[in-house]
Swiss-Prot record:
Compartments it resides in: Mitochondrion inner membrane
Species the sequence originates in: Schizosaccharomyces pombe (strain 972 / ATCC 24843) (Fission yeast)
Keyword Ligase in annotation: no
Disulfide bonds listed in the record: C39-C64, C43-C60
This protein's name: Mitochondrial import inner membrane translocase subunit tim10
Similarity comment text for this entry: Belongs to the small Tim family.
GO CC list: mitochondrial inner membrane; mitochondrial intermembrane space protein transporter complex
One Pfam family of this chain: zf-Tim10_DDP
The keyword Kinase belongs to this UniProt entry's keyword annotation: no
Length: 89
């Protein structure tokens, strides 16, 4: 068995699966970039006094990331529930 299907000549690649995987990677990249921008803006001063994060900045970033993922998960569950209640034709 080869990694990523390399060397498998008998199996075709489904373009729809590739498109879905690319869309998922793009979505995760967007979430990560928004998370970094949001938490950096909230927790880190624009004037850097030290090369490393201070304890306060580190704690703030940790809490910010945690809250961001909690909110994202809650919103996803809410949207999924609404989608099940009101299916589109």
């Amino acid at each position: 068995m080869s990694m990523f299907g390399i060397g498998k000549n008998n199996q075709t690649i489904n373009p729809q699966n590739i498109a879905m995987a690319e869309q998922e990677v793009e979505m995760m990249s967007d979430i990560f970039n928004r998370l970094v921008m949001t938490c950096h803006k909230k927790c880190i001063s624009p004037k850097y006094y030290e090369a490393d994060l201070t304890k306060g900045e580190s704690v703030c970033i940790d809490r910010c990331v945690s809250k961001y993922f909690e909110a994202n998960q809650s919103l996803s569950q809410h949207m999924q529930k609404r989608g099940q209640e009101n299916p589109t034709p």
